[in-house]
Amino acid sequence: MVDIKISGRKVSISEALHTHVDQKIGDALKVFDITPMSCDVVLRVDKNPSNPDRKTAEVTVFVRNNVVRVTASSDDMYVAIDEAAEKVSRQLRKYKTKVVERR
């Protein structure tokens, strides 16, 4: 299992958020038989009141010869993390099929 580095910008990372990120992003990384080199998760809260989706989760996964980067925003941090996990899963599926087709 790859170590997931979690950092927060303008937000403190609680134990519940840390557990949720480990569970959701970790499960998305385990689904496909891909061993990423590293994974970085940045959770950010924007202070702009006119932006309804102020909470953002950015996930960067470094795999061999490729980088998968997704961003998801929502008004709830947990929803943003869930959306980012779905996007990572979709991108890794595309990467996996591309690698298999080129063999």
Range-by-range predicted roles:
Residues 1-103:
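N-terminal, polar/charged subdomain of small-to-medium soluble alpha/beta proteins
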